[in-house]
């Protein structure tokens, strides 16, 4: 008796591009334009964080777009692709889901754009994964830097001390 799920035998799609950005614009010709690729978020606070923030009872909300372009997706029609996120020292939580249909399948590639409202609790690296059938396809991290109210942003060529 074969106890292996046949979906586990399918090769996973290959990642061509995966990044966080401000937005993704699709032109009339179908070409995707990624606006401002980011790998970190700096929050410059106007007042100190409340003490309960460290206990995860208060969070800062931040909107982010995650874009990925996948190849070799033919075997995954009708499946949902999910974006999962993990805060520093925490487990993964589902952030969003997109159903893969043929209409989103131009020339052998699949582009997925997840727009998520993230609840950020404390500074550090937040990990994100795109999954299909609970199998990880790609992982990217986003660093959260929280600047205290008394520290301003550094200008170009300046180092923050």
Give each language-model segment a name:
Residues 2-132, 136-161:
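Contiguous segments within soluble domain cores/interaction surfaces
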């Amino acid at each position: 008796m074969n106890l292996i799920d046949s979906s586990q035998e399918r090769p996973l799609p290959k990642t061509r591009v995966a990044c966080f950005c401000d937005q993704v614009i699709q032109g009339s010709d179908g070409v995707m334009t990624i606006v401002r690729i980011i790998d970190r978020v700096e929050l410059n606070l106007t007042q100190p964080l409340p003490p309960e923030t460290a206990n995860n009872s208060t969070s800062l909300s931040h909107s982010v777009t995650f874009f990925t372009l996948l190849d070799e997706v033919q075997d995954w029609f009708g499946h949902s692709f999910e974006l999962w996120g993990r805060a520093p020292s925490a487990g993964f939580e589902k952030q969003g889901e997109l159903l893969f249909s043929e209409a989103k399948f131009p020339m052998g590639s699949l582009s997925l754009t997840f727009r998520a409202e993230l609840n950020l609790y404390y500074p550090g690296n937040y990990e994100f994964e795109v999954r299909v059938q609970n199998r990880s396809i790609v992982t990217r991290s986003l660093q959260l830097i929280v600047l205290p109210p008394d520290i301003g942003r550094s200008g170009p060529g300046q180092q923050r001390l």
